[in-house]
From Swiss-Prot:
The modification Cysteine persulfide is found at residue 399. GO terms for molecular function: 4 iron, 4 sulfur cluster binding; hydroxylamine reductase activity; metal ion binding; peroxidase activity. Keywords: 4Fe-4S, Cytoplasm, Iron, Iron-sulfur, Metal-binding, Oxidoreductase. Belongs to the HCP family. [4Fe-4S] cluster binds at residues 3, 6, 15, 21. This is Hydroxylamine reductase. HAMAP family: Hydroxylam_reduct (MF_00069).
Length: 543
């Protein structure tokens, strides 16, 4: 096995024995084989698109299949085998359609012709030969590095496209790029500059995917408004829902109405409390726990069932394996998988389990500082900057993880001067989300913009402020201090680079899949840099 797509990869180089995420070598091989099969499907789809025969079922399958290969999504070998077989069936169907439409009948490249083994062990063996270090990708290490950057970015795009599609938002251009990008992995004529261009194109398309998801979320549930969310618990039966998918949450709220069950969010579902069409449910109570990497202890202590809607799932303890449920692309062997948004089993389990036997007091936090909320007070923000009440904005955002070095982000926020504002989004916020940082002229100094996909909202805020001050985004009193963990973060980083945003500080470590030569290109063109210490970075930024 060889996998280095996440920040916590072993020794900062790559997982070769077992995944730090809990992924077994057999699962890694099947994920590699699934990507390989999707490359083959994409090669046919690129050609078939010219004849107008790529139906929606191919688009939908491709994004869902790619989503299953993200870190901490699908650990179920049988499920991955089903995806592989389905990819090949669809590929052959598409060849037939292409031929019937007058297109070419034969494809000779290996991914477009491969046949899955008849059994799981055979597939695993096939997967071991088509991984990230195989000749599926370029021999040149720098081109291969850019191929992998693009591949991981495409996985992030696919995740956002899947979320958006569930809410009825899609754009053919997103699907077309996914096919083009995957098929390009087999184009030996592409050089270093071509791959830099493709990586940045991935960033451009990811902006569109996030825009679609934003339209789906706000169009369905309203724009987020400032909302207080309790971190304590209310006496009564309880269900915990984690992940990102707001529609899954909505369906759970509808099906639990009047049943005496309180619904709690976990992880990246926290911002859901700010959406008007969700917070109208009286039994949508509060937030439980912190970021994904703490779930093993937090889930074990939760007195009700847990629903995982999207990444990030870790190996469940035996103590709660019988009360954790997966949905959509998420799967774990032994955990019940919910289909068609039917929560009957979850509700039954919640009524059987004890729930909270007494009220548990806790702090309250504020959420709901999406672009509409922040831009509604833009005049006050602009005045505060002009009057030198507000010196600087920091976007401290991104993924959380288990590495000790991530304490940097807590310390950074704690050391930010009193005349500065911190915007945050994604699960990295759980390092400091419950801190009372006060306000500047009525504007809270800590603003939760939302989920990781709400990077779109943060970009819109930055662009609006740049317009108001009549400067470029890079000339704003704004610094980006980002943490990354998985492939959605890779896609967001590519989006920021596509927009020309410079001086990004990235941590806690740089991606293992970026070679020194590729890093040099990023430094020269975008001045991207690793984090150092909070004190040094603040001094460098503020002087």
């Amino acid at each position: 096995m060889f996998c280095y797509q996440c920040e916590q990869t072993a020794k900062g180089e790559g997982c070769t024995i077992s995944g730090v995420c809990g992924k077994k070598p057999e699962t890694a091989a099947l994920q590699d084989l699934l990507v390989y099969s999707l490359i083959g499907l994409s090669e046919v789809a690129v050609e078939a698109r010219l004849y107008g025969v790529v139906g929606h079922e191919y688009d939908e399958f491709t994004v869902k299949a790619l989503f299953t290969t993200l870190t901490n999504v699908n650990f179920d070998d049988a499920s991955l085998a089903e995806y592989i077989n389905r990819a090949v069936v669809l590929r052959e169907q598409l060849k037939y359609r292409l031929k019937a439409a007058g297109g070419r009948a034969e494809f000779t490249d290996a991914p477009a012709t491969f046949k899955p083994a008849a059994d799981l062990n055979g597939m695993i063996e096939q997967g071991r030969n088509v991984g990230l270090k195989s000749d599926v990708f370029a021999a040149d290490e720098n081109i291969r590095s850019l191929q992998h950057i693009t591949l991981f970015g495409i996985k992030g795009v696919a995740a956002y496209a899947d979320h958006a599609m569930i809410l009825g938002q899609e754009d053919k251009k997103v699907f077309e790029f996914i096919y083009d990008g995957l098929a390009a992995m087999r184009n030996s004529k592409l050089g270093l500059n071509d791959w830099v261009g493709l990586a940045l194109k991935c960033g451009e398309i990811n902006i569109r995917a996030m825009e679609l998801l934003d339209a789906g979320n706000t169009g369905t549930y309203g724009h987020p408004t400032i909302t207080r969310v309790p971190l304590g618990a209310k006496k009564g039966k309880a269900i915990l829902i984690s992940g990102h998918d707001l529609k899954d949450l909505e369906m759970l709220l509808k099906q639990t109405e009047g049943k005496g069950i309180n619904i709690y969010t976990h992880g990246e579902m926290l911002p859901a409390h700010a959406y008007p069409e969700l917070k109208k449910y009286p039994h949508f109570y509060g937030h439980y726990g912190t970021a994904w990497q703490n779930q093993i202890n937090e889930f074990a202590a939760f007195p009700g069932p847990i629903v995982m809607t999207t990444n990030c799932i870790q190996k469940p303890r035996d103590s709660y394996l019988g009360s954790i449920y997966t949905m959509g692309s998420v799967s774990w062997p032994g955990a019940v998988h919910i289909k068609n948004d039917n929560y009957d089993q979850v509700i039954k389990k919640a009524l059987e389990m004890p729930g909270f036997t007494e009220d548990k007091p806790g702090k309250e936090i504020l959420v709901g500082f999406g672009r509409n909320t922040v831009l509604s007070v833009a005049p006050a923000v602009i005045d505060a900057v002009k009057n030198k009440q507000l010196r600087h904005f920091f976007l401290v955002a991104g993924c959380d993880g288990a590495k000790p070095g991530r304490s940097y982000y807590t310390e950074f926020v704690e050391k930010v001067p009193q005349d500065c504002v911190v915007l945050t989004l994604a699960c990295g916020k759980f390092r400091f989300f419950d801190k009372d940082m006060g306000a500047i002229g009525g504007i809270p100094r800590l603003l939760d913009v939302g989920q990781c996909n709400d990077a779109y909202s943060a970009v819109k805020i930055a662009m609006a402020l740049a317009d108001a001050f009549k400067v470029g985004v890079n000339d704003l009193p704004l610094s980006m201090i980002l943490s990354w963990y998985e492939q959605k973060a890779a896609a967001i980083l590519l989006s920021l680079l596509y927009l020309g945003i410079k001086d990004i500080r990235l941590g806690p470590s740089l991606p293992a899949f970026i070679t020194p030569a590729v890093l040099d290109v990023l430094v020269k063109n975008f001045n991207i840099m690793p984090i150092t210490t909070p004190e040094q970075d603040l001094k460098a930024i503020l002087g």
